[in-house]
Amino acid sequence: MNLGDGERVRAIQRAWAAGEEVRGWACYWDMVHGHLVRLLGADAQVRAATKVVRFEDLCAAPAETIRAVLDHCALPDAERVVAQFTPAIRAPDYYQSPLSSAERALIREETASTANAMQGMR
């Protein structure tokens, strides 16, 4: 996905071509989410129309999160939807991360600034 920063896209492609899969995906995540941070920071209308939901928050508090999304969108029947979908939402327990501690550190290094900016958007 090219979000207007061709050099960034080329850097991601170079990382992947060099076998740096984790770095490439971390940079890709940072590019996409950085675009979102800038868009929401620059446009009050877009910011007001947007509800950012972290997957971890949805899994930790599904009823509250679904209710907040439906309220944000001014959709009816929130309690029916909450009751229907909440029981099925949970954090995955079917895999262990294959990432090494060095790879997790690399991801944090590549994404820290954007991840911190995203914290204020919840």
Task: Name each model-derived stretch.
Residues 1-122:
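PAPS-dependent sulfotransferases, especially Golgi type II membrane carbohydrate sulfotransferases
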